[in-house]
Regions:
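ABC ATPase NBD coupling module
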Residues: 68-83
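Q-loop/switch helix immediately C-terminal to the Walker
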Residues: 88, 94-110
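Conserved structural motif at the start of ABC-family nucleotide-binding domains
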Residues: 2, 19-23
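Walker B catalytic motif
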Residues: 159-163, 170
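Helix-to-loop junction immediately C-terminal to a conserved catalytic motif
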Residues: 52
Length: 247
């Protein structure tokens, strides 16, 4: 379980301190698929980077399973059980997919397990296990290989920052299928995704909306999603709310 207490992050400009995240409180329970959304510039990616240890908070505390990780950097947080997937996955010329999976796992990984991780993200294992992680791979392929490394690592909290960025529609559809499988098979850990995409929001157990550096809405998907979308469900939610107020 991840707990954020009064977490803040600010940067100094020429005149004053600009607050990007302000006294934010958030708990992510174990075995939950949580999506963070909100307007551009609201602080979503900054929050993800603070949780991963890429950015250090200017105030507040971060706890993982009760242990204070506030001062830990990205390497120390990875060792504690937090993984972070970048918007644009890194390419490694000269390194094969199997080598990358073995490095990510942090242990001796056999070929059968490596092929299983690739299969779980919708890749034909025999076609990819010996491929180099280089420019010959598409953005969608790289995203799925990166997710396979997260599975191999077996972390307590897996963070994906706008995983849909830079991939085509076909790759996005495959990505959705991967996340749906991850949601169905989630155990001994949680998934946190930063996204605007309705199809990713629809997979969530919980949705957190961040605007102006603070949480504006938070709750189960079925409670929050209708407020975010101009759909029939939103109209129905509005009607029920109005009728309740009039009763």
């Amino acid at each position: 379980m991840l707990t954020l207490e009064n977490l803040s992050f600010g940067v100094q400009d020429e005149k004053s301190q600009k607050e990007i995240i302000r006294n934010l409180n958030l708990t992510i329970e174990s075995n939950k698929f949580v999506v963070v959304t909100g307007p551009n510039g609201g602080g979503k990616s900054t929050l993800a980077k603070m949780i991963a240890g890429i950015e250090m908070p200017t105030g507040g505390r971060s706890l993982l399973d009760g242990a204070d990780i506030t001062e830990k950097n990205i390497t120390e947080r990875a060792q504690s059980g937090i993984s972070y997937a970048f918007q644009q996955p890194v390419r490694f010329k000269g390194i094969e997919v199997f080598d990358l999976l073995r490095l990510a796992s942090g242990k001796e990984l056999n070929i059968t397990d490596a092929c299983q991780y690739l299969s779980e993200v919708g890749l034909c294992a025999k076609d990819y296990i010996k491929r180099e992680v280089n420019d010959s791979l598409s953005g969608g392929e790289l995203k799925r290989i990166e997710i396979a490394t997260v599975l191999a690592r077996g972390t307590k909290l897996s963070i994906f920052d706008e995983p849909e960025a830079g991939i085509d529609l076909w790759s996005f559809q495959n990505l959705i299928a991967v996340f749906e499988r991850m949601r169905q098979n989630i155990k001994n850990g949680s998934i946190l995704i930063i996204s605007h995409q309705e199809r990713i929001l629809d997979i969530a157990d919980e949705i957190v909306v961040i605007a102006n550096g603070q949480i504006s809405m938070q709750g189960p998907k079925d409670d929050i999603l209708p407020h975010l979308l101009g759909t029939a469900s939103a109209v129905d939610a509005c009607t029920k709310f109005y009728n309740k107020e009039e009763a």
